[in-house]
Structure formats: structure tokens, C-alpha cells
Amino acid sequence: MLIYKISDLIVFNALKSIKYGFLEIKKVNGEVLKFGNPDETLKVFLEIKDESLNYNLIKSGSIGLGESYMKDFFITNNLSDLIELTAKNIKTIYKFSGIFDLPFINFIKNKIIKNTKNRSKENIAKHYDLGNDFFSLWLDKTLTYSSAIFDTPEQELFEAQNNKYQKLIDLIRPTNGNKILEIGCGWGGFAEYLGTNYDVKLDCITISKKQFEFAKERIHRCGLNEKVNIQIKDYRDLKDKYDHIASIEMIEAVGQNYLDSYFNTIKNNLTPSGTVGIQAITIDDSLFNRYKNKKDFIQQYIFPGGFLPSKGELQNYVDKNGLKLNEYNSYANHYSETLIIWREIFNKKWDLIKKQGFDLKFKKMWEFYLSYCEAGFKSKNIDLIQFSLQNK
């Protein structure tokens, strides 16, 4: 088809200007093209199996690449490296990625489709309610679905997850008898750790029915019912005062239109001398304006309603709501390592996952998702941060 030939011309011409890594492409007709510096450490081989690949990239960007992987339109020696190469050459990729897309339409969709309370529940259910059995097969025994922080490269994932919890606790500095809120408690890993190691009262909220049921039973099993209260509640319905507030990678589910509500809720539920500890994934400030008006693979297939704020955007809402940023730490490399471990276990446990009713398309979708995130952190296009807040 003519449109495929035109797409090839656009993509291959743009790839001539890549500055990082080396990419070798074998076309459907057997012709081999080489781009970049062959002396680079990051070397990627890609074999095109369907002539529509480049058209899909031009039409839909990361969504097109992910869908093409799911349909076996290409094979590569290393999917994560391929995505990392595109991420490190993002300005080159932007010359063709999604240029047939309609930014205005995406902008309108983002404005119309908001994370209301009901829609937030639907969005969470689509991902987290895939099933506790599914997630328990490939997460560590803390059942923690957020980045670990490793003290050493050899540290086990379980220990690194508890290390992450401790670092966040160190940011909020709780003392005996304090009343603490966790916004977005997942399966209760942080609640168990905090309740076991500190003499505090803890309210934990989630809007996932499956997570609520699991976390409630977990806390009961640990004998922590007197200290920890798990609730199904939207953060916008909170009306209390807490000495400390913690939130681990929940802000990504808030949505662009509700970041103000999120920080306003924190402000209104924090005691005057209280502290806040947040772990968040952020997108680089230089990429934010393009990102906020376009849907990517993760928003399309993994986290509907998901949105990564930039550090600048976070600072704006922190200031607007009368809060002050204190300590701040970056852990991007720790997330890429966490994702590598998750992907390896996911693939190792695939036969068991498959028995739960998931098909090969689902497997490839998750392989792409985990590799996509890993590459984002390696390239520093996205970051993992822990930071503390207090009232001004």
C-alpha cells in the first residue's frame, strides 16, 4: 500500500538523526538498514514482520508500537532496550510518532473524560481487580505493587520493599500515639509494616473492592485490628485530621483535573504541625506539555484515567494549597530494577497465570507494559520520587 511506503520514508528518514544507541532494522523484503553509532553500548535489532508497522507508529505512537508487538508485527532482540533507545532519542521519535493523530481530539477527550468518583472506581477495577491471585503470583510476599528501594544491588525484593516503606516513614517521622492516614493502601503492605513496627493509629483507604477485602483480612490475620482500619473510601470524601499522611504511587491515578483536589484534601486533613510523605512517578518537565494532551499505551491498555504529573506541576499544586516541600529524593534506577524483577517473575510464572484465563495477547501486553516503564526510568524520561510536605 502507498500509505505504508510513505510511512517507511518518514520513519527511516527521521531515524537517520538518532544520537543515542545503534538500531539495525531488517525490513519485510530482507533489506537491512542501520541507524546510529555501532560503537554504542545500547544496540538493538528489530525485524519487521508486517508492512503496517511504521504506519502504526506514525498513526498512534506508543499505542501503535505496543499494539504491533501484541500482534507480532515485529520481533526484537530486547524489547526493553528498543523502547529505551526510542526514549533516549525522544526528540527524533517525535518527528513521526503519532503525527497522524489529532492532538485537538485528544485534548477534548482529556477534558471530557474526568476521574469522577464513579469513573475512578471503574478505572481502578479494570486494573487492580484483575484478581489478587494474579498479582500474588509475581509480586513479592509483601504484595507490594510499587517500586522498591534497594540498599544494595544484591538485596532481595521483599527486603527492598520494606526498605522503601521505612524511607517513607522516615520522611513523616511518626511518634507514639500519632494518627496516620494512608491514601491508596493497595493490598495493605505499608499498613502491616507501619502497624507492626510503630505504636500508632492508622486509617487506610482504597476504592478497589478486591484490595479492600484482601487488606482487611491481612490486618486481621496480623492481629492489628486495634491499630489499623482499612476502609473503602474515595480520598475526596475524607473529613478528619491526621498527624501524618502517607501515599505511595496513588497520585498517578488521580488524573490531571483532580490534582488540585488531591492536595486540597491533604491540606484539609492535616493537623497544623503535621507532615506528609508521598511516593510518586513523574514525567520530565520538558515532555509534560506534549504528554498531557495525548494518550499513551499505559493509559489506553493498563491504567485508564492514569496521569503522570511533572515535578513542576506538583510544585504548583503544593504551593497553591498552602503546603511546603521539604525533603526530596529520586529513585528512578530503583524502579527500573524493580520492573526487571517483576518481568522476569511474570514470564517465569506465565504457565500458572495462563491457567487463570489470560491469553497470549494479555501476556504480550504486560510484557510491553513492564518493558515500557523500565525503559522510561532508565532513560530518565520518567522518575520516581519520595518527598515530604508540611503546612506553610
What does each model-identified segment do?
Residues 215-216:
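Conserved SAM-binding loop
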Residues 282-392:
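Substrate-binding/catalytic lobe of Class I Rossmann-like enzymes that use SAM or dcSAM, i.e.
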Residues 1-162, 167:
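Feature captures hydrophobic
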Residues 236-245:
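A short acidic, Gly/Pro-enriched loop at the edge of an enzyme's catalytic core
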Residues 260-272:
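A short glycine-rich, Lys/Arg-flanked "PGG" loop and its adjoining helix->strand segment in the class I
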Residues 273-281:
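Conserved beta-strand signature within the Rossmann-like core of class I S-adenosyl-L-methionine
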